[in-house]
Amino acid sequence: MSYKAGSTKFTGLLFCALLFLSQPTIATEFWDLPPLPPADEYGNILINRTSNSKGIKPATFSHWIHRRKFTCRVCHFELEFNMKANTTEITEAANREGKYCGTSGCHDGKASFGHKKPDCEKCHNGDKSYKKERFSELSRLPAARFGNKIDWGKALNKGLTTPAKYLSIKPDADISFKETLVLESEWEGTPPAIFPHRPHTWLLDCSNCHPDIFNIKKKTTKHFSMIANLGGEFCGVCHSKVAFPMNDCKRCHPAMSD
């Protein structure tokens, strides 16, 4: 082998090695990742379906306050809140009738504050940073790099959080579907994404993902892509606003280097 050929081959190998080692950096620079709010606001939403039109401030909802106490299933299956904000026809009248937030075990005036006038501003304040001083209560939980900067999965596995799986509608049985999916990347040089069902079925009901988000029967998953995820589809329904964001590449692509 000539010196020139050997040098070219070495340069190529070096480039590939550097490319692999810098994958997370390239990913965050290549993809148009949305800017992240402060850790104490990540997952906070404003419920404003009808509030402004009625001269009322939008209601603030903090996922990190609630997810310590309840699994996703409680709100998004049992209480029938849609996965997308401001698409559930929640009303104050319904709350007072014991539906949605007013369900027994939630904001019923017993388990937590109810719907009397002195309590109104605890929700209807229009401020995503409301009660951010409580975020320090989470300082003992395992750290993560993005989102709330809390590794909620580790916190759950270590018993540092013990969210309730139900209020009154108990799951028929523990969902034992544990299959782990390996999703090959559409980009050369990027390692596959790993999807473990078990951590998701512990927090969610199967119907939270299937068939609306992932319709396996109709083969809509053939349109699954990183671009679709970043657009709020598929994994992006959760992993863009509440669950750890897609900036945290290695959480899904574990073979990536730090």
What are the language-model segments listed below?
Residues 26-258:
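Short sequence/structural segments immediately N-terminal
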